[in-house]
From Swiss-Prot:
Originating organism: Pyrobaculum aerophilum (strain ATCC 51768 / DSM 7523 / JCM 9630 / CIP 104966 / NBRC 100827 / IM2)
Annotated protein name in UniProt: Cysteine--tRNA ligase
GO process terms (BP): cysteinyl-tRNA aminoacylation
Binding site for ATP: K276
Protein encoded by which gene: cysS
Key word Disulfide bond present: no
Tree of life domain: Archaea
A molecular-function term among this protein's GO annotations: zinc ion binding
Catalytic activity: tRNA(Cys) + L-cysteine + ATP = L-cysteinyl-tRNA(Cys) + AMP + diphosphate
Residues engaged in binding Zn(2+): C29, C215, H240, E244
GO CC annotations on file: cytoplasm
Signal peptide interval: none
Predominant localisation class: cytoplasm
UniProt motif ('HIGH' region) ranges: 31-41
Amino acid sequence: MGVRIYNTATRQVEEFVTYVPKLARGYVCGITPYDHVHVGHGRVYVFFDMFRRYLEARGYEVRLVINFTDIDDKIINKAREEFGHDAYKRWKEVPERYIAEFFEMSNKLFIKPAHAYPRVTENVNEMVAWISTLVEKGYAYVAPDGSVYFEVGKVPNYGVLSRQKIEELIAGARVEPEPGKKNPLDFALWKSWTPGEPWWNSPWCPGRPGWHLECVVMSTKYLGAPFDFHGGGADLIFPHHENEIAIAKAYYGLDNFAKYWIHVGYLTVRGEKMSKSLGNVITLREVLSKYSGEALRLAYAMSHYRKPMEFSFELLDQAEEMVKTLYTAYDELSQAVADASDEDKEKLEYGKYIESFYAALEDDFSTPQAAQQLYGLARYIISTVLHRIDKASRQTAIDVLTQYVKMADILGVLERREIPKEVEEVIKAVVEARARLRREKMYQLADYLRERLAGIGVELHDFGQRTYYTYKRR
């Protein structure tokens, strides 16, 4: 069975077929770096990291691009709050600070680096060129103050992504009217300069690009058009992604410049949508100072990506315990592989977990079911495989371990499994010495070594004459 994913553009779960076989080109809208990254951001980027890992496991090359909107009203306002009259000179410090935090938190969440992280400020010339083309084609117009607006009414089927009609949007007063606009729904491609704000030159006036244009220009610059998938949070469907489609349709003549539109649901805290206005925003720094990145990844995985996720620290406690179980299974099986025999005396029934894991991901990326199967396999390893390892061939044991690691790698939840080689050699030597002491019935000294190892995070598990160890990662 092939990969199947929900496409917001068609409102259907569709088979994922890329334009170029085994090459998946994707763009995910990045942060506007004016404040701390929060767990809502984390959910989006962890999902697309898992999706990427899964595609790579299926043999795809994945080219992923994530942008930074490093100039925006929110950044300017933040700079004014912090620097006052010096904001014009020091505004760049704001995005630099929070972009650095984004990368720091991404590392702690074991998110694989994207292939490019374009910034708006590095692509202004390309954006000016796009606007000039749109004006020439008659899809954009220059307002009296030099701002340039996209004329929504010139594009057929505007609202196709969000399934809304222009008349209904106007009647619902979804967009604030501005001087110089022909239509309240028209949006800025170029914003005229306001004294005290950063600006760039253009044929119309000093100013800066509009948000919706920025993502179209950067995505197609790095991926071409059309490309395979475009993603972000569900809150971006309208107006941001809707307006991107309109711009690309006018520029390229394409009905859709991305084949699949993939959106991640929002987070709730105590039943309310997480937002600054409600004061219930939880930052990634706060969470990752108390919990492992793998626990947060697993907590995200326990909710289907398209559904709202109720976030709680109780959920993280549960996820952290599950991560410990996953590591225990990995560590104990890794140690036990060496003791397996050379021939099968008994079959190990582990295939159902693997089949169900991949079947879940093939069906609109159901990570709750996939996580359940991975955890089920971990428990099976601990309760069954280790106690019957002498009856299974070494190759069977290796196969179990290999498949287990592949599954965990897709969800990104065994990322700290490697122990430094020097440390591992010392641990093995002490474990072997303790085993000799036990054989010679020098139990008091053997117990002393067990206690000393426990003090550095190494737990010993005795199965008859065999001893395995697990390493508690810090």
